[in-house]
Structures are given as C-alpha cells and as structure tokens.
Amino acid sequence: GGTSTEHKISIQTGFAVAEAIKGVHNLEMINLEKEIYQFPYNLLDSDLVFNALHGGDGENGTIQAYLDLHHVAYTGSDSKSSKIAMDKNLSKLIVQSVDILTPKWILIKIDPYTGIKLENYKTPQFPFPYVVKPSNEGSTYGLSIVHNESELPAAIGFAAEYSNEILIEEYIPGRELTVGILGNRTLPIIEIKPSHNLFDFECKYTKGMSKYIVPAELSDEMVWKISKDALRIYNTIGCRHYARADFGPTEFI
C-alpha cells in the first residue's frame, strides 16, 4: 500500500498483479505501510520485487534506490528515471527539450512552514482556464480547474495540501489519450471518455464512470506520431520495463 495518498490504489494494483501471476511463481504479498527505514527485511531475500506502489516513495525513486542499495531486482524504472517521471515540472522540461509539445506552465514553490511563496509569483502568460495541481502527485489529487483570478488562491491552497511545488498549467479541452509502453514497444492507444468534464479520481476508480475505447479512433498518421513521441519520452527519461504516457487532444498534438 505504501504511505502515499494513493495507498488504496496501490493495494488494488497489488491484488490485480497477484491474481495475474499466482500459480506461475511463488508469491508473497507485502503491504508496505511504514516508512522506508522500517522496510521489511524479508523482502531482501526475494528473487524479484514487483513494485505495485503508486505515488510517494514507491514512484519517486526512494524504494528503487533502497532496493538498488541491497542489490535486489525489481520491476519498473530505476531510481533516477522514477524521480524524473514523478516530478511533473522536470518531466515537462525534458519533454520540451526534445521538441515534444506540452501545455504551457509555471511552477510555484511554497515554504512548507510559512506558506510563503519562495519565488516571485508571476501571472501566467497564457489565458484562463488553468489547471492547478501538485507537481508530484498522481490520481488527480489536489487538482483544480481555475476559470478566473478569484479562484486561483483557493486552488493553490488546495494543491499545497499535497505538495510544496505546484504547477499552474494551461487547460486545453479535448480528447484524453493514453499509451502504454511494454519493454520498448508501444501498446494500442486508449481514448478515455470520463463521465465528468475532467478525468478525476472518481472517474478513474469508480466502475462505469469512464469509457475506454481500445484502440482509439485515430488516423494512422496520428497513431504513428503519438507512439513515436511516447517512446521518445520513455527513452529520454531513461525508463525501463513499462510506462504510460498521457496525451491531450489531437488538435494540440
């Protein structure tokens, strides 16, 4: 489960993985509810750790670095690429550096003790609406859509409950596309159609709240471009084994 806000989601993933591989391998499920310094030592005798943790130490490179230190094999990306991929600001900078389009954004850093912004806050140089979200959270925790200046302080405060680094990003309405990568091969692109205007926590994890179209109805050219860009991101960050990349509306891509 882990100690992150996505504890319950991690447990769901763990049970799904266990169901998929039971009878094929000797399996021990471990519900990690403690800090990293209380990591279960019996895990260090494993041939392979299948990391099913979402968010926090499970995705930000901490668990990965711990397992590397003890020479334990594990699934997923290494500590360096995990840290990069979990940091939305850093990953967007890397995506931008290889000429892949990403929505415009600014980063706000906040002192965790005083709540004072550590950098001079400048109004974003793009029009409303904005997406305001923590820079290192998943499952849309702390995320808000802001339509005008008066809504911005509350949205920043909400995001600050989850992180001291907050992204204010331009909101681009349109299709929600995601592409999985396994090994060094892209999987069929999925289009997600949530019941709400936003693919929020409820739509992600409540049965029947979203429709998934597989494969997404896209031109061959668009499939090629999205798949190519997903692999470029994957390889540039240095991911391994598996990953997923989300893309906005095809008009933007």
Give the location of each predicted region.
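ATP-binding N-terminal substructure of ATP-dependent carboxylate-amine bond-forming enzymes
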Residues: G1-L93, S97, K109-N120
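Active-site nucleotide/adenylate-binding loops and adjacent lid/helix of ATP-dependent enzymes
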Residues: G1, L43-L44, I84-E169, P173-R175
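Phosphate-binding site of ATP-dependent enzymes
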Residues: H147-K228, T250
